[in-house]
Regions:
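Hydrophobic alpha-helical connector segments
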Residues: 6-36, 88-89
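Hydrophobic alpha-helical segments that form the core
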Residues: 29-31, 80-119
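Amphipathic alpha-helical packing segments from all-alpha helical-bundle domains
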Residues: 33, 51-76, 86-94, 101
Length: 133
């Protein structure tokens, strides 16, 4: 929805917390959204041509936002320098969607996301992540 997009866009403007914290918040919101509907509905949306443009537009919005926060995290020295925001965002979002389509629990998907982001983090980033547990 447009309200959701506006709220998510405000994450970019927030100065509280690190970019990595905002990355987690965004990823967790994406995950929460996937669990608002049945996985079979998501599968239908993904494969029906009538919904393809909307699905692609939605995916591109999330990819762009997540890539922005990943790059900002890298600039803050919280992610490894070899991480390329756009392609890493693509992989994370694709994998999260696949996990949801394969009926992984929300907790499993959150844990996966946390593990992947922690694995891409610098020592300073890992310390921030672990401090938030």
């Amino acid at each position: 929805s447009s309200k959701q997009r506006e709220r998510i866009a405000t994450y970019r403007k927030r100065r509280s917390g690190s970019a990595l914290q905002r990355t987690f918040k965004l990823a967790y919101e994406y995950i929460a959204n996937l669990y608002m509907v049945e996985s079979s509905f998501l599968s239908d949306l993904r494969h029906k041509i009538i919904y393809a443009d909307h699905f692609d537009e939605h995916r591109e919005f999330w990819r762009r936002e997540l890539a922005h926060h990943l790059e900002a995290s890298k600039e803050e020295g919280l992610l490894l320098p070899e991480i390329e925001g756009a392609s890493f965002a693509d992989r994370i979002l694709e994998t999260i969607l696949e996990l949801r389509l394969n009926n992984a629990t929300r907790e499993e998907v959150y844990l996966f996301c946390r593990t992947i982001l922690r694995g891409a983090a610098t020592r300073q980033g890992i310390e921030r992540i672990d401090r938030k547990r």
